[in-house]
């Protein structure tokens, strides 16, 4: 926008022309206006909202963080909308969260809140929570000390910390697929080379490792129990095989074990249980058993790694919320967490069986699936040729049913992730019948 001439401005504001000249010089110095010789003086475009938006869009292209794929962005945007049926959602429904236990733990925390330190944390986490995690890990065959445990703001936060504080740039990450990690871009941010190891061919992981044997900067990322999204688990023999190969070739293992407490039959050991040389970095979280909003997870690793991560963390966020850590500690200390788990496993198994019964009645001729012995999910793979993207958008736009298509997890199959953890049985039944109707239609 062009501004009036100096003479016009002097007349308009009834001031001396010298005042106008000095004002223009000052505004030019601040960058608000600019002068074109022989043309006049103009207001800078950056004050225009449309221009600002375009500039931000340009600058964001330089960001080291990639945006999620469009389907993931859409899912993230809609999955908090209660008007939709969320048949794939990876969290507990409200009725399954331990509301009474949380209230009691919060009350106990509040009763001695004056004893808490509300200053900046040291990056390692609340000592009492770390100690009680050590105690619980010991009962599961993992013998570590407080110095081997660091509290994080969830499992994904732990992986992000490892990405920037442990793995070098241009590292090679060999991970099982399909996996939720593919929907996060967490390994793509630092130019990591992401190599897929299909979960149903996990025994061939040695061959994949051999292809990169001369690369020093590499790591394995494994979900050993109740993989998200397939619900599959590794056998003890497979876990031992991975450990043996890891030790032989000096390859660290990142073990993502977030569903460790949600099992419907005898629990199997973590990969960390077989670790004798400290090659396994074990990650878990309370997000799947208490609530995502609690934002508390942990890392178990060698003392040197924990020390490094704690130092890096002090450069980022100074640690997780002390209040959330205290609440989780109270639930663990008074055993209410374990009582909650007993009930949770029973209810989730019942909901899983309810979903499987409907699948057997409707989908057995057009799809196949595995029966998971824990976690939240049933992985539905269609036998027929179907456009999963079309199914996703049709259900979303016409039925307000949100499904998570398999391709966001790196799957090449015609697949979707189903969850029995979030919705009521009534909504599960309704959603599955609608999915069946649309699949038969297309």
Curated annotation (Swiss-Prot):
Domain HTH gntR-type: 2-46
Signal peptide, first to last residue: none
UniProt cross-references to InterPro entries, sorted A to Z: Aminotransferase_I/II_large (IPR004839), Class-I_PLP-dep_aminotransf (IPR050859), PyrdxlP-dep_Trfase (IPR015424), PyrdxlP-dep_Trfase_major (IPR015421), PyrdxlP-dep_Trfase_small (IPR015422), Tscrpt_reg_HTH_GntR (IPR000524), WH-like_DNA-bd_sf (IPR036388), WH_DNA-bd_sf (IPR036390)
Domain of life assignment: Bacteria
SUPFAM superfamilies attached to this UniProt entry: PLP-dependent transferases (SSF53383), Winged helix' DNA-binding domain (SSF46785)
Record-linked SMART domains: HTH_GNTR (SM00345)
Keywords: Activator, Aminotransferase, DNA-binding, Pyridoxal phosphate, Repressor, Transcription, Transcription regulation, Transferase
GO biological process: alpha-amino acid metabolic process; biosynthetic process
Family: In the C-terminal section; belongs to the class-I pyridoxal-phosphate-dependent aminotransferase family.
Protein name, per record: HTH-type transcriptional regulator NorG
């Amino acid at each position: 926008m062009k501004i009036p001439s100096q003479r016009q401005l002097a007349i308009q504001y009834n001031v001396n022309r010298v005042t106008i000249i000095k004002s223009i010089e000052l505004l030019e110095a601040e960058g608000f206006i600019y002068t074109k010789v022989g043309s006049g003086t103009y207001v800078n475009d950056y004050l225009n909202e449309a221009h600002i938006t375009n500039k931000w869009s340009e600058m964001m292209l330089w960001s080291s963080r990639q945006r999620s794929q469009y389907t993931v962005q859409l899912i993230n945007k809609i999955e908090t909308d209660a008007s939709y049926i969320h048949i794939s959602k990876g969290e507990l429904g409200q009725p399954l969260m331990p509301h009474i236990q949380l209230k009691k733990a919060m009350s106990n925390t509040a009763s001695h809140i004056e004893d808490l330190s509300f200053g900046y944390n040291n990056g390692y986490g609340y000592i009492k929570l770390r100690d009680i995690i050590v105690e619980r890990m010991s009962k599961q065959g993992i013998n570590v000390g407080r110095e081997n445990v660091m509290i994080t703001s969830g499992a994904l936060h732990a992986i992000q910390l490892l990405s920037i504080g442990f793995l070098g740039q241009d590292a090679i990450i060999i991970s099982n697929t399909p996996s939720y990690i593919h929907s996060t871009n967490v390994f793509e941010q630092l130019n990591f080379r992401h190599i897929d190891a299909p979960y149903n061919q996990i025994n061939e992981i040695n061959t994949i490792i051999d292809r990169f044997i001369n690369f020093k900067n590499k790591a394995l990322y494994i979900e050993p129990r109740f993989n998200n999204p397939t619900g599959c688990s590794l056998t003890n023999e497979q876990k031992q095989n991975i450990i043996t190969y890891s030790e032989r070739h000096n390859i660290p293992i990142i073990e993502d074990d977030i569903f460790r407490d949600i099992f419907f039959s005898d629990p199997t050991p973590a990969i960390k249980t077989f670790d004798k040389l400290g090659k396994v970095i074990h990650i878990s979280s309370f997000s799947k058993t208490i609530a995502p909003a609690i934002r508390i997870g942990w890392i178990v690793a060698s003392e040197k790694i924990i020390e490094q991560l704690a130092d890096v963390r002090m450069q980022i966020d100074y640690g997780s919320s002390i209040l959330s850590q205290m609440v989780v500690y109270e639930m663990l200390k008074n055993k209410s967490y374990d009582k909650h788990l007993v009930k949770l496993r029973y209810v989730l198994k019942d909901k899983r069986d309810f979903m499987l019964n409907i699948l057997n009645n409707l989908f057995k001729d057009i799809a196949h699936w595995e029966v998971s012995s824990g976690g939240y999910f049933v992985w539905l793979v269609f036998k027929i040729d179907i456009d999963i993207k079309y199914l996703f958008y049709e259900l979303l736009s016409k039925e307000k049913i949100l499904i998570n298509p398999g391709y966001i997890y790196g799957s090449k199959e015609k697949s979707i992730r189903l969850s029995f953890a979030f919705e009521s049985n009534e909504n599960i039944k309704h959603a599955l019948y609608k999915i069946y109707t649309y699949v038969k239609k297309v």
